[in-house]
Amino acid sequence: VLIFQHDSGLLKDGIEEFLEWDFIGSWIKNIPGCMNGGLSIRNPKLMYEICSKHRYKGMAVHGNEDIYFTNKMRELGYKLPDKATCNKFAVETEFEYGSVGYHAIDKYHKNYNLLLNQYD
């Protein structure tokens, strides 16, 4: 399933290249190994499995669902991408040209319109 929040955007074709992953989203710079879910692709069967078998008890520092899912999925050995692959899919805190999409870049990049104009 594709999660596409209001502050997300697609910049070019290619989203189908990332369907192999159980979860992929933009890399979260200050939380190693975690991905943001604002623009993400998730395996719904695995999301359901995690919710039904692993009760959510909150996280010590970050309690958002994307942090919970990516931490739990890494712990359980699901198929998750590395940072370079995440950046090819979507960017957020660290902008890299060539990404298929973005999430919430206006929060982290003052001149985000200039970055997006590079795709026109």
What label would you give each PLM region?
Residues S8-C34:
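Conserved donor-nucleotide/metal-binding helix-loop-beta segment in metal-dependent transferases, i.e.
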Residues V1:
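Short aromatic/hydrophobic "clamp" motif used to bind/position activated sugar donors
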Residues C34-D120:
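Catalytic core and acceptor-binding pocket of nucleotide-sugar-dependent glycosyltransferases
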Residues F4-Q5:
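Active-site acidic Asp-centered loop
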